Regions:
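C-terminal binding/interaction regions
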Residues: 10-20, 100-201
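A short beta-strand-loop structural module common to alpha/beta enzyme folds
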Residues: 34-49
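Helix-adjacent hinge/juxtasegments
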Residues: 56, 60-96
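Solvent-exposed alpha-helices and their adjacent loops that cap or buttress functional pockets
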Residues: 2-4, 64-68, 107-109
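Short, solvent-exposed amphipathic alpha-helices that sit
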Residues: 19-30
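Structural motif
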Residues: 46-58
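Short, structured coil segments at secondary-structure junctions
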Residues: 31, 89-92, 110
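Extreme N-terminal starter segment of soluble prokaryotic enzymes
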Residues: 5-9
Length: 201
């Protein structure tokens, strides 16, 4: 598997997301990242129907499912359609973000392995900041002050990975618990940034 710790990232975009993807791709490559791009390229044929947003989303999702890559960045006009498609693949936890705090929380709290952005709403500069927040942090990063933060959120990830709708329905629409953890919310200590960019890579 190509891992973020080794500065390996999968990227893809449809035609609407292409301009934003290109800006972020160049930015990351300048920082030493190896980018594997499986979407629209400069010379792509606009009539190639394999490059429709949902087909690219499924392509990326399948590469995460097959453990070719640990994480991916994907782009379309809104980020929504390509994210819905990628989410159809088993084990994919995709999120759409339009802010740096959302990108930070997507990885640190939800373990998102596919992050989507929309070129209609996210500027290149904001997109670069979102990419940094996502790629330079890991699950649980920056939440050490919240007791059991990672345990609480890992239960959700595990139950979502194991989710089977027919079993859920047969169980009276109740989730099969794979663990439990108290749900107390904690206030962030005063002066602590909600987005501590922990640039480890």
């Amino acid at each position: 598997m190509k891992k973020v710790a080794d500065k390996q990232i999968l990227m893809a975009a449809d035609f609407a997301g292409y301009p934003l993807k290109e800006e972020i791709k160049k930015y990351l490559e300048k920082k030493g990242w190896t980018v594997t791009d499986v979407g629209v390229k400069a010379d792509s044929d606009p009539n190639d129907t394999e490059l429709m947003f949902h087909r690219i989303g499924l392509r990326v999702g399948s590469m995460i499912t097959e453990k070719e890559f640990e994480r991916a960045l994907i782009f379309c006009g809104t980020g929504m359609g390509i994210h819905i498609a990628a989410s159809k693949c088993p084990g994919v936890h995709a999120g759409v973000v339009e802010s740096v705090p959302a990108a930070f929380r997507a990885i640190t709290g939800n373990g998102v392995n596919v992050l989507a952005m929309g070129a209609f709403y996210v500027t290149p500069e904001l997109g670069k900041q979102c990419a940094d927040a996502y790629l330079y942090n890991d699950f649980g990063s920056g939440w050490e002050w919240w007791p059991d933060f990672d345990k609480f959120h890992q239960i959700a990830i595990d139950e979502l990975n194991a989710f089977n709708y027919e079993e859920y329905k047969a169980n009276g629409f109740k989730v099969k618990h794979l663990g439990d953890c108290h749900c107390e919310l904690y206030d962030r200590p005063e002066g602590l940034s909600p987005v501590p960019l922990m640039c480890k890579r």
